[in-house]
A protein has these predicted regions:
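Interfacial segments of alpha-helical transmembrane regions
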Residues: 38-62
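Hydrophobic alpha-helical transmembrane segments
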Residues: 27-44, 119-124
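Short helix-capping/hinge motifs at transmembrane helix termini and TM-loop junctions
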Residues: 29, 44-45, 72-73, 115, ...
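Alpha-helical transmembrane segments of multi-pass membrane proteins
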Residues: 56-69, 125-132, 154
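Alpha-helical transmembrane segments of integral membrane proteins
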Residues: 21, 25, 48, 52-56, ...
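Membrane-water interface at transmembrane helix exits
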Residues: 41, 64, 68-73, 111, ...
Length: 183
């Protein structure tokens, strides 16, 4: 299944679709769109949600990129098959997809706080995840598991943040919490 979809995507490539997919994949590189969105939300006064988004991205980076990729060491399809790549060939391992997991972690966290915007960001996350398959740098299973991992991380981070961290900050660091809320 993984290889059939990859081969199909290679057959349907064209210049217009290539340019869209390059732009979409770069939105997720380094978490760019999620960090920019978080900065804007923080600037607009949404401090609690902004901190939660950052925490979900940090937690996701540790679990996905530092632990799982290096533990499982799945080679990327672009390392195995000689295919002309449209983007730089990543040097880290393939499974799970960091773009997919970080995108879903951030998008779902955003949707917890901003229901109306949530669907837009989840669509962006899905497009970013799909673009990684299109670019032949991930197998579909890398992206599916990455998206599921990001979803779980968003839920866990939100629950821990709401029940423990936020409460602790309010009770024990009231002056700092008030200052951050004021900025």
């Amino acid at each position: 299944m993984d290889n059939k979809l990859l081969q199909f995507l290679l057959r349907i490539r064209n210049k217009r679709l290539n340019s869209y997919m390059i732009a979409i994949t770069h939105l997720g590189t380094g978490g760019a769109i999620w960090l920019i969105t978080t900065f804007i939300l923080f600037y607009l006064g949404y401090r609690i949600s902004s901190v939660n988004i950052i925490l979900s991205l940090i937690f996701n980076g540790i679990v996905c990129n530092l632990i799982l990729k290096n533990l499982l060491k799945r080679k990327r399809p672009s390392w195995i098959s000689k295919v002309e790549l449209l983007i730089k060939n990543p040097k880290d391992f393939s499974f799970p997809s960091g773009h997919a997991s970080s995108s879903f972690a951030a998008a779902l966290t955003i949707s917890f706080y901003f229901k109306g915007m949530g669907i837009i960001f989840l669509i962006i996350a899905a497009l970013i995840a799909f673009s990684r398959i299109y670019h032949f740098v991930h197998y579909p299973s890398d992206v599916i598991i990455g998206a599921l991992l990001g979803t779980v991380i968003a839920i866990v981070t939100k629950n821990v943040y709401d029940s423990l961290l936020l409460k602790y900050l309010q009770e024990n660091m009231g002056f700092l919490f008030a200052f951050i809320s004021y900025i």
